[in-house]
A protein has these predicted regions:
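Positively charged, low-complexity intrinsically disordered leader regions
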Residues: 2-42, 49
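Short coil/turn connectors at secondary-structure junctions
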Residues: 9-10, 17-19, 54-56, 154-156, ...
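A short, flexible beta-alpha/helix-coil linker loop
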Residues: 28-30, 67, 236-238
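Acidic-glycine-rich active-site phosphate/pyrophosphate-binding loop
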Residues: 32-43, 120-124, 140, 224-232
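Short, glycine-rich nucleotide/cofactor-binding loops
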Residues: 35-41, 157-165, 239-244
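Short, hydrophobic/aliphatic alpha-helical segments
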Residues: 36-52, 150, 294-303
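N-terminal active-site beta-alpha-beta segment that forms phosphate/nucleotide-binding
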Residues: 45-213
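Conserved phosphate- and dinucleotide-binding cores of soluble alpha/beta proteins
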Residues: 187-337
Length: 337
């Protein structure tokens, strides 16, 4: 089975030498694998803001490389232990995508490690943590995929939304290895089309029977018995079992509940234990022009306004189960995961 580009982050976000980060621009996939060179943390932050990297875990590690570049710059200036400057860089990187919790958690961990190991080079300390984080992220994705695969029955068609990360790809991989015939229906996920460009493409590269639909077709497909299960990811899971994910997740959960279709969240490492309630999760609001244009071309009149919340909150009562490395959990019991 072909392993798609997005199954392993190190294939599309990686260092070139010691002072440059290469990011494969996901906005250009699958038509081209355009390389973007970042030489400082500000360029990394802009790349994240401009959606060149997507997915909470991948964004966090990419931002970690941004902090590494900030440390390298300080070391070239013979001021490699200036924690105030590193903190400013971390704050800039954290501000790029405020809804997901992985980014802020990793930034805090990296700064703490640098403070703790006062005798070492900050860039080397950061890079060592990032290498371990990459390995751990792969292990978590694989374990989550294995847990999720047990929920599938041969003959199922799974509805996906946006790009749910490597765990989703591993779920399909393990199902295929176990002889299960599983199909996918992917929402295109406006306005950046992650479902079309990333999820549908990746699954088709793996040999999965994959069908693309527009976002407004999901309820119809459910009503016709075309979908047996729904799987999405989570940018943040609150301790009350509420989930923040790509906008549109809530409406899929409502439709799935009405149709009696199981709705699962790939929760990877589990909840953010500092976020008690879903209502506490900040919702990123992006530039409305991203809705008014498609690949730079206006799609409506000049007087039309737009609104673009990038995420929504799905309450626990609409979620069948949250899949983590440790198993499948009822949303209201996710605090014990």
């Amino acid at each position: 089975m072909t392993e798609p580009l997005l199954m392993h982050l190190e294939n599309n976000v990686y260092l070139e030498g010691e002072d440059a980060l290469i990011i494969i621009d996901r906005r250009k996939l699958p038509r081209s694998e355009a390389e973007v060179y970042c030489t400082d943390h500000v360029e990394v932050a802009r790349a994240i803001e401009q959606m060149m990297v997507q997915g909470a875990g991948d964004i966090a590690i990419t931002a970690g490389y941004g902090l590494y570049l900030a440390a390298r710059e300080l070391e070239r200036q013979n001021d490699g232990r200036d924690m105030a400057v590193l903190k400013q860089a971390a704050d800039r990187l954290c501000a790029t995508r405020p809804t997901g919790f992985h980014l802020a958690a990793l930034m805090g961990k990296l700064l703490e490690r640098v403070r703790k190991h006062a005798g070492g080079k900050a860039s080397e300390i950061i890079l060592a943590v990032l290498n371990k984080s990459l390995t751990r992220q792969r292990e978590i994705s694989q374990a989550t995929g294995r847990q999720a695969e047990t929920l599938l029955a041969s003959g199922d068609t799974v509805l996906t939304h946006c790009f749910a990360g490597a765990g989703l790809l591993y779920m399909f991989k393990y199902a295929k290895e176990n002889g299960k015939v599983i199909k996918a229906i992917c929402t295109e996920t406006r306005p950046y089309l992650q479902g079309a460009r990333l999820t549908a493409w990746s699954l088709s590269e793996m040999g999965i029977d994959t069908t693309l639909i527009t976002d407004n077709m999901a309820a119809y497909c459910m009503s016709k018995g075309m979908i047996q299960k729904v799987f999405t990811a989570a940018d943040r899971i609150a301790m009350d079992g509420a989930v923040a994910n790509k906008v549109g997740t809530l409406q899929l959960a409502i439709c799935a509940r009405h149709m009696g279709i199981p709705f699962y969240i790939l929760g990877y490492g589990g909840p953010d234990r500092r976020t008690l309630r879903g209502n506490d999760i900040p919702i990123e609001e992006r530039d409305p022009r991203e809705v008014l244009e498609f690949q730079g071309t206006p799609i409506t009149g000049e007087r039309v306004q737009a609104y673009y919340p990038a995420f929504d909150i799905t309450p626990p009562e609409l979620i069948t189960g949250i899949v983590t490395v440790s198993g499948v959990h009822k949303p209201l019991k996710i605090a014990s995961a």
